[in-house]
A protein has these predicted regions:
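An N-terminal assembly and electron-transfer interface module characteristic of large anaerobic redox
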Residues: 1-171
């Protein structure tokens, strides 16, 4: 979402004393973001999402984008973590349920129980569940990164899952 952009522009504007220029820049960025999100929203609105991740680190901007698209984050499922996360960027979205210790073999059941339309995960094995899924990465930062990822989310919602996604019928 635009939260990180807003924070960065505010800090940079304050540091350089270019508050007016920062406001003009941010207004243009917000407008460009809103235009694209508005065009994508009808394709995503009302859909439910399950995150399948190692930790909450760096989830907020993704949750912001999904919220802007009119989507509901049903839960954040964490896979078994074998090390301590030192990132420190825990999600500020504390009202979203967390499901701890979900193995890849239990992901399909968790998704079915929640009635989700899409799984968001950095684990490519997620595709084997038979659910639509989208990765967590984008090649860009800021507005461009948020919009690139939003477009991926919407594209993945339009792909029909097939048996090959979870290993059946491909022998």
């Amino acid at each position: 979402g635009m939260r990180g952009v807003r924070e960065w522009v505010a800090a940079f504007s304050e540091m350089t004393g270019l508050r007016e220029a920062g406001s003009v820049f941010l207004e243009k960025e917000e407008k460009a973001y809103s235009e694209v999100i508005s065009s994508l929203r009808p394709k995503a609105e009302g859909r439910k999402v399950l995150f399948y991740v190692r930790s909450d680190a760096d989830l907020d901007w993704r949750i912001d984008v999904l919220t802007d698209l009119g989507m509901e984050v049903a839960a954040v499922a964490h896979w078994h973590n074998r090390f301590v996360e030192h990132d420190g960027r825990e999600s500020t979205y504390t009202g979203i349920p967390r499901i701890e210790g979900v193995d890849i073999c239990g992901l399909r059941e968790a998704a079915e129980d929640l009635g989700v339309d899409l799984i968001v995960s950095g684990d490519a094995r997620t595709g084997r569940t038979g659910y639509r899924w989208v990765g967590t990465s984008t090649m860009y930062i800021g507005r461009e990164g948020a919009l690139d990822w939003a477009e991926k989310v919407v594209r993945c919602l339009s792909i029909k899952p097939c048996e090959d996604w979870y290993g059946r019928g491909s022998e």
